[in-house]
């Protein structure tokens, strides 16, 4: 009942999409989103070692372009952890693939544990080519995926229209 109330209340307030930020809900929640007509923006869970404030908060807001194959910079130096990430990403996609309301996959948000985001987008696309992918939501865009989302908190933002992706 609480799940239904929360989703219905968001619809009443005018929302048509909910973001599942770094977590996966029980399947019943997705069922109610399907039934009530609420779209879902699905993030993958964060991972990696302790994050550096410089890489997560400072450099990203300076607009610096950083390649995400610098694993130590993104707190992803552990190769076994990177392998495990793909195992869990595959499990999440397989679990939620038939969710009608699922509208967008997001493997990485704001650089938290980000690595090889272009490869992550390819991995997702091979498992599910029916939904758009925001490969690096917010910061450290690597030029891939279907969407370029910018999380801009501290300075005025000036929009530039992209030709190859939605922005």
Model-derived regions: residue spans:
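Metal- or metallocofactor-binding catalytic centers and their adjacent structured scaffolds
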Residues: 13
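N-terminal active-site wall of soluble small-molecule enzyme domains
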Residues: 4
């Amino acid at each position: 009942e609480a799940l239904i109330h929360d989703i219905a209340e968001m619809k009443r307030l005018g929302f048509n999409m909910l973001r599942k930020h770094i977590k996966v809900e029980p399947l019943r929640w997705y069922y109610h989103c399907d039934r009530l007509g609420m779209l879902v923006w699905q993030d993958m869970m964060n991972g990696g070692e302790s994050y550096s404030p410089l890489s997560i908060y400072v450099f990203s807001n300076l607009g610096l372009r950083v390649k995400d194959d610098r694993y130590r910079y993104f707190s992803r130096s552990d190769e076994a952890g990177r392998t495990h990430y793909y195992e869990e990403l595959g499990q999440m996609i397989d679990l939620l693939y038939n969710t009608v309301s699922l509208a967008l996959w997001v493997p990485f948000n704001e650089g938290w544990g980000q690595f090889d985001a272009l490869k992550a987008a390819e991995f997702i696309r091979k498992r599910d080519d029916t939904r758009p992918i925001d490969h690096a939501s917010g910061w450290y865009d690597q030029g891939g995926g279907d969407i370029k989302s910018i999380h801009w908190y501290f300075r005025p933002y000036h929009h530039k229209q992209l030709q190859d992706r939605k922005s």
